[in-house]
């Protein structure tokens, strides 16, 4: 914030600096999005947003008719958890709360069984906490495709964490008949959306919940799918602690997504 105040121009403004929770921030963002000019192109840097805030932002853009034409920018990570060895990677620890994301409540009917869908990332503990909280009748775990990953190193780490999570689930012996897996793109949100949609087409009559835990680009894809299919709920697991000293180092390229 100090950098912003030092370098800001007269028309620049800081939104949400006094907010103490996500609902207050969403209200402030809604006022800003509502005022976006239709004569100017909106460019949003999503790099440092939480998965929850990113999904809310997309919901607001859609609600106020500003989604089409908006450009999302994302600086991919060169390395995650750069203050640890590759075998000790951690991005967050613990889960404070699990909640549905504002704008994506879904349609949850008591008469239907629950289907939890997790595009898996590096945070196995968060995924385990979500599975334990929801106790779904059906569980789908997504793994990023090698050819649709940011880098081979990211794919290898992600694949290792995917196997850890699947091994945990297998050991519980709760989903022997109802566990399924799918692959998805980590670099193209439209592909991600279609990958998840194709997988979900195999199921019907369920309360579907998606918990995006991979990179922000795939979260965009999940949110876009849920805008098309509003019966799907999006959930977010809020960590107790982030690896603030070594979460990620910036890569040397920026992904631009034209919505």
What positions do the PLM features span?
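Long, low-complexity, Lys/Arg-enriched
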Residues: 1-42, 49-259
């Amino acid at each position: 914030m100090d950098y912003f105040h030092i370098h800001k121009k007269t028309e620049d403004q800081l939104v949400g600096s006094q907010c103490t929770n996500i609902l207050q921030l969403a209200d402030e963002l809604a006022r800003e999005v509502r005022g976006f000019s239709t004569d100017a192109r909106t460019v949003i840097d999503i790099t440092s947003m939480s998965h929850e805030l990113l999904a809310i932002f997309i919901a607001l853009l859609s609600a106020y008719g500003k989604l089409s034409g908006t450009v999302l920018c994302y600086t991919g990570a060169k390395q995650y958890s750069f203050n640890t060895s590759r075998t000790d990677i951690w991005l967050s620890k613990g889960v404070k709360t699990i909640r549905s994301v504002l704008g994506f409540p879904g349609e949850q009917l008591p008469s239907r069984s629950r289907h939890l869908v997790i595009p898996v990332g590096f945070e196995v503990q968060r995924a385990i906490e979500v599975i334990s909280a929801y106790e779904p009748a059906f569980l789908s775990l997504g793994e990023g495709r090698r050819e649709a990953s940011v880098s081979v190193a990211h794919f290898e780490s992600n694949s290792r964490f995917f196997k850890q999570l699947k091994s945990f689930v297998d050991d519980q012996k709760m989903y022997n008949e109802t566990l399924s897996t799918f692959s998805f793109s980590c670099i193209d949100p439209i592909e991600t959306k279609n990958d998840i949609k194709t997988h979900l087409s195999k199921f019907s009559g369920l309360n579907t919940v998606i918990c995006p835990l991979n990179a922000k680009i795939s979260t965009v894809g999940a949110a876009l799918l849920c805008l098309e299919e509003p019966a799907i709920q999006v959930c977010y697991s809020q960590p107790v602690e982030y690896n603030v000293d070594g979460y990620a180092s910036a890569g040397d390229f920026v992904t631009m997504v034209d919505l």
